[in-house]
Curated annotation (Swiss-Prot):
It catalyses: adenosine 5'-phosphosulfate + ATP = 3'-phosphoadenylyl sulfate + ADP + H(+). It comes from the Bacteria. The gene is cysC. It comes from Bacteroides thetaiotaomicron (strain ATCC 29148 / DSM 2079 / JCM 5827 / CCUG 10774 / NCTC 10582 / VPI-5482 / E50). It is an enzyme of class 2 (transferase). This is Adenylyl-sulfate kinase. The keyword Kinase applies. ATP binds at G35, L36, S37, G38, S39, G40, K41, S42. HAMAP family: Adenylyl_sulf_kinase. SUPFAM superfamilies: P-loop containing nucleoside triphosphate hydrolases. The lineage of its organism: Bacteria, Pseudomonadati, Bacteroidota, Bacteroidia, Bacteroidales. Pfam families: APS_kinase.
Length: 201
């Protein structure tokens, strides 16, 4: 039967996620980093990917640079666009997961509702929320891109942590404060959590 909008489902004829995971020898999960700009999300994500790669595990990192320059290059930073940004990221992440690929996302994703939306799209059993809890003072001190300085001068509106709020996650799978933990320590804690979930026995 023809579905609405002329969409004909073919999912029942496609290779399954389990087939892909068997081929790759891994279980796919979503590792979702949230935290302030400059907290260390992307740095940890890249280091984690390298460690998993060394173990023969296939990963894909999604972050602001590769998403905003591509699939989301038509979105701005209004509240509506921020929600749509995360929705698209979650949908793309779901496709990677269904291909058996361990997916790592590093986005500020500043409130619980937006992260809950992502978890619901991806599937809560697959969604590991990692809160990079580095304090604002430390993030602002680093200010690698000069964004905090611009936000303090009013040159950037609705900047999370300065002129827009960040809601602390209620029940993250893991919290990492990079002002107290080294990169190696952060990655080791992640590996302790992640490896039992992704390695096929």
């Amino acid at each position: 039967m023809e579905e609405k909008n002329h969409i004909y489902p073919i999912f029942d004829r496609m290779m399954t996620r389990e087939d892909k995971e068997e081929l790759l020898g891994q279980h796919s999960v979503m590792i979702w980093f949230t935290g302030l700009s400059g907290s260390g999300k992307s740095t940890i994500a890249i280091a984690l990917e390298r460690e998993l790669h060394k173990r023969g595990l296939l990963c894909r990192i999604l972050d602001g640079d590769n998403i905003r320059s591509g699939i989301n290059n038509n979105l701005g930073f209004s509240e509506t666009d921020r929600v749509e940004n995360i929705r698209r990221i979650a949908e793309v992440s779901k496709l990677f997961l269904d291909s058996g690929i361990i997916t790592i996302a590093a986005f500020i994703s500043p409130n619980n509702d937006i992260r809950e939306m992502a978890a619901n799209i991806i599937g809560k059993d697959d969604f590991l929320e990692v809160f990079v809890s580095t304090p604002l003072e430390e993030c602002e001190k680093r200010d690698v891109k000069g964004l905090y300085a611009k936000a303090r001068k009013g040159e950037i509106q609705n900047f999370t942590g300065i002129s827009a709020p960040f809601e602390v996650p209620e029940h993250p799978a893991l919290a990492l404060d990079t002002s107290k933990l080294s990169l190696e320590e952060s990655v080791n804690r992640l590996l302790e959590m992640v490896l039992p979930k992704i390695e096929k026995k």
